[in-house]
Amino acid sequence: MVDNGHVTIAMADLGTVVEIAQVRCQQEAQRKFAEQLDELWGGEPAYTPTVEDQASWFQQLYYGWIGDYIYKAAAGNITEADLPPPTRSTRTYHIGRKLSRQAHADIDASRRWQGYIGCEVVYKSEAEAKGVLRWVGHLQQSDYPRSLVAGVEWRMPPRHRRLAVLGSAAALHNGVVHGERLFWPHEDNYLCSCEPVEQLYVKSKYNLIPPRPPPSPDLLRTLFKVHWYHVWAQILPKLLSDVTALMLPVLLEYFVKYLNADNATWGWGLGLALTIFLTNVIQSCSAHKYDHISIRTAALFETSSMALLFEKCFTVSRRSLQRPDMSVGRIMNMVGNDVDNIGSLNWYVMYFWSAPLQLVLCLLLLIRLVGWLRVPGMAVLFVTLPLQAVISKHVQDVSERMASVVDLRIKRTNELLSGVRIVKFMGWEPVFLARIQDARSRELRCLRDVHVANVFFMFVNDATPTLVIAVVFILYHVSGKVLKPEVVFPTIALLNTMRVSFFMIPIIISSILQCFVSAKRVTAFIECPDTHSQVQDIASIDVPDAAAIFKGASIHTYLPVKLPRCKSRLTAMQRSTLWFRRRGVPETEWYEVDSPDASASSLAVHSTTVHMGSTQTVITDSDGAAGEDEKGEVEEGDREYYQLVSKELLRNVSLTIPKGKLTMVIGSTGSGKSTLLGALMGEYSVESGELWAERSIAYVPQQAWIMNATLRGNILFFDEERAEDLQDVIRCCQLEADLAQFCGGLDTEIGEMGVNLSGGQKARVSLARAVYANRDVYLLDDPLSALDAHVGQRIVQDVILGRLRGKTRVLATHQIHLLPLADYIVVLQHGSIVFAGDFAAFSATALEETLRGELKGSKDVESCSSDVDTESATAETAPYVAKAKGLNAEQETSLAGGEDPLRSDVEAGRLMTTEEKATGKVPWSTYVAYLKSCGGLEAWGCLLATFALTECVTAASSVWLSIWSTGSLMWSADTYLYVYLFIVFLEIFGSPLRFFLCYYLIRIGSRNMHRDLLESIGVARMSFFDTTPVGRVLNRFTKDMSILDNTLNDGYLYLLEYFFSMCSTVIIMVVVQPFVLVAIVPCVYSYYKLMQVYNASNRETRRIKSIAHSPVFTLLEESLQGQRTIATYGKLHLVLQEALGRLDVVYSALYMQNVSNRWLGVRLEFLSCVVTFMVAFIGVIGKMEGASSQNIGLISLSLTMSMTLTETLNWLVRQVAMVEANMNSVERVLHYTQEVEHEHVPEMGELVAQLVRSESGRGANVTETVVIESAGAASSALHPVQAGSLVLEGVQMRYREGLPLVLRGVSFQIAPREKVGIVGRTGSGKSTLLLTFMRMVEVCGGVIHVNGREMSAYGLRDVRRHFSMIPQDPVLFDGTVRQNVDPFLEASSAEVWAALELVGLRERVASESEGIDSRVLEGGSNYSVGQRQLMCMARALLKRGSGFILMDEATANIDPALDRQIQATVMSAFSAYTVITIAHRLHTVAQYDKIIVMDHGVVAEMGSPRELVMNHQSMFHSMVESLGSRGSKDFYELLMGRRIVQPAVLSD
């Protein structure tokens, strides 16, 4: 029996004890996780009262407290520091922490049923049907995907299950439903089923418990729980605003009666005018207070949601991020767009009850005016409601589909920006741009559907109140009654009120539906399991000499496997009544469809070795990150389903890592070295066995993670600065020479991902960060592979054996000559430990000779061994070594591992450019450029004419009713009626035309702006990407494009709507009562001055807000990439504090926009109230002067129109400000379109357009085949594939005008088919040479001949097509193995397998169930760094049409044996190609035809390896001798051809 609270639950059998224990462990883990969250958020920062806190009630009412900020902002000299900070209750820390607590409480509550797993259950209606609860969760392929179901292993199944025929959808199963492995039964039988949890009882000792199904987590519900006060505070001002708005038609009725009365006194009329004035003022103040609270609540929703997303990015498990639908692009989209949609709900949430209330009150008032004649009009109203429901459902479906397409577009854009170097190296720009444009085209199709639905919405909502009033007046006429002014004008006023309510309906519904879609997406991410480290604290056990202990541990990761596609059995009619039907058996709803992927996927799931509870199912759209390669087979919007399947990485690990010692982990590429280190940090799942480790860990990854900060910031990493320690760290990490040449010293910005550092410098900065952290355990993942020989020697002596002496050091390396230095050695092979012991024991095994044969030849010095000292270079090498140590480092940084293009570019060491911020008004050129992109000025002229004509028709209906009611034309009643019906007809069918035309033009503009932006970024020079953070560029494609797609189109539409409405109102007022100009003229002047101040202020605030978003995106992307490093160093709380500070700035800017709008609105509307009072007052004077009945009718019409002027002006001002503020996004997009320096690729636009056209109706695979045909066919005919020749004559190169030369008169010649190695110290110009070959940088002197032609005679893409580039930093993209090695899909499967075999990856890929079609996760996270590099090599080997192969230290992260095998393969299989290799491992180029030694940008030496090494005065000879006796011996053996690895043979 198990005690569950106060109830004793019956365990089913002894086998469930483990499951019960697992549940208890989960509960304990939840408690510990709550403590981790408290530590993550830390204490509340100090608070200083703000200006808003100290404002009086009158200042709060009329927003006087913000006046100083508005005038300062209008002057155009504000920065983020000038923004008033948020109040204590609205700070991101405060609201984010509250939301975090509530969200985790809701998630824990939703998992309450997990506590019953392993308990005995009974079917609700059959007491004899008993079984054991094995699983609780949600079925993916179900018509009720959010319904909680229970997986039960039955002893006696329910009757409806027993009657099912085996093989049918309702049959019992063995834990697999629709190909989805839900759980593993204890008995290997088919006695399992999934039942709705409400159909089960949990059996206790005394009775049956009917546990209530917990509610599913819902971010919206959680937000309302947290911010309930701000939500409820909107009710009172909204109610007061609505009531006073409805009082105005009543007051108008009495005023019209006063004007028509024969004996009315002037005092009564003046009292009515004053009452109308005061009612208007109260309505204005209460409406703006409501807007203030609602928009503030929206800002709180946004910032607290972003804070929660940041927290989740820090705590989400690695397993969750393996899900295809949780890509970086999707997370960025959630922060950029989804939280905005969630926040916007608060702008309109009160209209849920306000709009119906207003309509009901309007109907009651109409009944009061016209009696029973209102009933047919009400029928018209109710007829339109079902139509609105149908349109709403369509909009929701389209919005969900569009959200997934936007995810796909952003993911593809992020991949392009993150891997832009390899994209340019390989000439893939058209492919990537076409894929993004394809996603954009699908997004625009969805946007078109939304726009069409909105036009229908507006048609219905515009037509409904007009038809209602028309029906009323027709029946009024038919009944024989005479229209009178006291009936007509209050009715018109009520009609205008109804128009506002109906006008809000499409906005409300659209906002709500978008909010629901976004909340669902964010909730899915928040629900992802958090990381719960299975590494136990070694301090809990008494093992003083151990730093970590593995005890029979099995280390696993999770990979997604596609499930077979199934379709619903329900008919369309059944689906439409889905929520009204009884929820039946889940499995009966769906059936498996025949598809090429179904059987394979199902087989993959069933054949994969998984453990109990080790699977997790996920869902994604076919347009989303997952399965995009299959979109040719899946209709747009169809879903694809995946299951996360456990994969064993390390098996049965039993290992004790000694404390305070140096442990070296060696093994071939992919053997599991990095996995072992990751397991110590808790990065992987421990499926069996146990693992203990110390908590104080510093981690140096194989690919250094560098923050976009200064050098000082990267080393300190949020620690306090200790000057003495910092200098010592810089010294021992060999950074002194680099610092001496950095113009800003320690304060030099080193760029995003360390873009202006070489690979070795990034490794040393990463190492310096670890050393400065002063931890107990150091995990070093092969940091020496990126270092020069002599630098690596000093690092070993000064850091690993020096400053870190006495610390626990675990070094993963390929360099076997370092093993004598190790206190403990661990050897890995194929995921298993084959040896663990000291060097003496290792030397006595056969492994020692085997590994020496496999791993020998590493580039670092052997001098660290017991028989050779650290300075064991020969006498001849000493001068060179000394010279190498003192090399001028002015060129030591690089683009992707070479030299720095921006060494002296910006003063004080600043590399990253400050984001541009325009000042003053948005220039007219921006408006003109935008209007041109939207179809041209002629099209907008037609649009304005359409708006003017339709507004004239709309105003004519009110004017005609006024004429009809006074009978001034002396026509018959039927004639009045027919003319009125004709006007109504034109009004109803004319209004949708302007909406449709406006949406169409705006959509064209969005398409063209995105296309131009994408093409501009696609051909931008590398210097742009080196100085611009990816987050800043991505902000243009997310936030700014979202504004152009959604916000700006509505802004222009409503701006024109309200502008022409205001014009018609003012014209009618002036024509009817010219004396009203006495009030209008000064009010218009005041309007103008206030608008000037406000627009300038709002514009500057909006610009700050736009800029404030970019650092948020940048920090989020850095956090996702460096999560492992940040968490290991225990700095998550500090990064979160930085994020909260940036979110406070975003909130402040958004809040200031809101309050500034209120500041302006209350002032403008007060002036409007004055105008209304003047109209009424003039009417009173006219009454006293004996005005005619005709004039009285026109005065009544003028007053009726003036009452709408207040709200019209309020919305007009808001839309003017919103449009001008949102035009900042157009300005920002145009800046990247027009101001970015471009490469000369004039054919790019046509290539992309051709590929996008060819994509129509075709799958991705077909498209990418077309890419190579269209982009390469013509060029191939002109320049057939041949071995390349290269001649450089006096080549000079500088990265920018005014900077020093990086290449100084370089001259050499490379013959066809030659194998050339380029060597030299970091900063000598090696990588710059390769960049010059690829024309990533342009030469400023000299000539380069490629295949006998000057390089300048080639087009840029033609030049790059001649070269296959293998960069230093491996970059893989989300997709399949085939797509990564052959993006153009022009190679056969046999050729792909052969290339993988040549680089040593065949066995690794063959181990996947889908082979070369197996999935590569985003960034290649399911492959080791070395394997990623091998994948890049296979990619280059398969590139066709090239005559050169360029390798930039491409084998730095693989073991030497595999490196030699690859080099031998290159020598034979590519004998017809010219190979140019940059290498620090001298043995890599020992068998090459020619060696070029670079030094300070010049060719210091050139010749064959044999010639150079035999010249004892040469620099190359000194470099070889600096390897030490054993290293130089290995080199000479390779040189003499005695140790050549036999290459694999490329099969046909």
Swiss-Prot record:
It is a multi-pass membrane protein. Its main location: membrane. ATP 1 binds at G667, S668, T669, G670, S671, G672, K673, S674. PROSITE patterns: ABC_TM1F, ABC_TRANSPORTER_1, ABC_TRANSPORTER_2. It comes from the Eukaryota. Glycans are attached at N263, N1095, N1154. SMART domains: AAA, CAP_GLY. ATP 2 binds at G1320, R1321, T1322, G1323, S1324, G1325, K1326, S1327. It catalyses: ATP + H2O + xenobioticSide 1 = ADP + phosphate + xenobioticSide 2. PANTHER family: ATP-BINDING CASSETTE SUB-FAMILY C, MULTIDRUG RESISTANCE PROTEIN E. In this organism, this protein is encoded by a gene, located in 'H circle', a 68 kb duplex DNA circle containing a 30 kb inverted repeat. Acquired resistance to methotrexate in the organism is associated with the amplification of h circles with increasing level of LTPGPA gene transcription. Belongs to the ABC transporter superfamily. ABCB family. Multidrug resistance exporter (TC 3.A.1.201) subfamily. This is Multidrug resistance protein. The gene is PGPA.
